[in-house]
């Protein structure tokens, strides 16, 4: 990755009722990264997001959490990108991924949204799918449960025991992306 400012976005839904749900793992990883940056989230009025400004892996980083619901998060992401003059190549979105087993972390550039409405909103608002993604596996729903219901459920007690470690590993993956770029970070992580 370049030495330009990076925009790292954790996806989730606002409000205490969503705080511990699978869909909010992006917010959880953003919290881990904010701790590493030594900062606290503050409202950025022009974008509709909460942000922390600081450094990670030797890079200037704007860490953001949209304050809108997941399916409307693109407006906040595009607003931050415009305000801080960050192009899509320097945006990393951290999000939950149904198609990966719980705790599996994968990095990718662009591609489809896989039914993820937060990614769809971001791609639409940025008018490109070519931004980096840190995908955090939450697993598939059991039986015939609707995936839309599953992502809004809390993690199981077994998963909760491992969640802090998963968030640390996802934060490590973001730092690898910032430091090494996609290919080298993928080689280390995958």
From Swiss-Prot:
Keywords: Cytoplasm, Hydrolase, RNA-binding, tRNA-binding. Its EC number is 3.1.1.29. InterPro entries: Pept_tRNA_hydro (IPR001328), Pept_tRNA_hydro_CS (IPR018171), Pept_tRNA_hydro_sf (IPR036416). It holds the Pfam family Pept_tRNA_hydro. GO terms for molecular function: peptidyl-tRNA hydrolase activity; tRNA binding. GO terms for biological process: protein quality control for misfolded or incompletely synthesized proteins; rescue of stalled ribosome. It is found in: Cytoplasm. NCBIfam families: pth. Belongs to the PTH family. This is Peptidyl-tRNA hydrolase.
């Amino acid at each position: 990755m370049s030495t330009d400012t990076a925009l790292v976005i954790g996806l989730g839904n606002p409000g205490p009722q969503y705080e511990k749900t699978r869909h909010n793992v992006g917010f959880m990883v953003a919290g881990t990264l904010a701790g590493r940056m030594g900062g606290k989230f503050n409202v950025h009025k022009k974008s509709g997001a909460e942000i922390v400004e600081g450094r990670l892996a030797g890079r200037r980083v704007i860490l953001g959490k949209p304050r809108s619901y997941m399916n409307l998060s693109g407006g906040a992401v595009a607003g931050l990108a415009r305000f801080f003059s960050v192009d899509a190549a320097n945006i990393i979105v951290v999000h939950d991924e149904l198609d990966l087993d719980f705790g599996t972390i994968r990095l990718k550039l662009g591609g489809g949204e896989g039914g993820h409405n937060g990614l769809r909103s971001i791609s639409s608002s940025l008018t490109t799918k070519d931004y980096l993604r840190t995908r955090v596996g939450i697993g598939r729903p059991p039986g015939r449960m609707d995936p839309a219901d599953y992502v809004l459920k809390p993690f199981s007690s077994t998963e909760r025991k491992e969640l802090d470690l998963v968030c640390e590993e996802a934060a490590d993956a973001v730092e690898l992306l910032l430091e090494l770029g996609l290919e080298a970070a993928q080689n280390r992580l995958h």
